[in-house]
Amino acid sequence: MKDHAIVIADQHGVIQHWSEGAAQLIGYPRDEAIGQRVDLIVPPEFREKHWHGFGNAMQGGPVEPAGAFFDLPVRCRSGETKVLRGQLHILRSEQRGPIGAMAILASP
């Protein structure tokens, strides 16, 4: 899975898990990413849309595209924006309430 970025954020959008693949594909070492808001990797021009969708998902709203593969622009440590292909998944508690989100991304 070193060629896949796995990023997990809590319900506030704070990065809780950053895989070795995320470090390789996006450029930030784990210790620089953990504890940061996902704004770290969301290009500025997409942040408003991102936070609208993330907030809706954390309130229990639908996620589009649920489990489907899609292209996602990601801001790398170098400052470049790279398009990665992947999926988003909402993480839920035993009571089924949203507690965070996981992205699994790879180079197309």
Cite the ranges covered by each PLM segment.
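Conserved beta-strand cores of small sensory beta-sandwich domains that regulate signal transduction
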Residues: 5-9, 73
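Conserved hydrophobic beta-strand signature of PAS-family and PAS-like sensory domains
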Residues: 6, 14-16
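PAS/PAS-like sensory domains across diverse signaling proteins
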Residues: 12-14, 24
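PAS/PAS-like sensory domain cap-loop motif
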Residues: 21-33
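PAS-family sensory/regulatory domains
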Residues: 32-48
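Terminal output helix/cap of sensory domains in signal transduction proteins
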Residues: 44-73, 78
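Glycine-biased flexible loop/turn sites that connect beta-strands or occur in inter-domain linkers
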Residues: 78-79, 96
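Short loop/turn elements at sensory-signaling interfaces that couple input to output
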Residues: 85-102
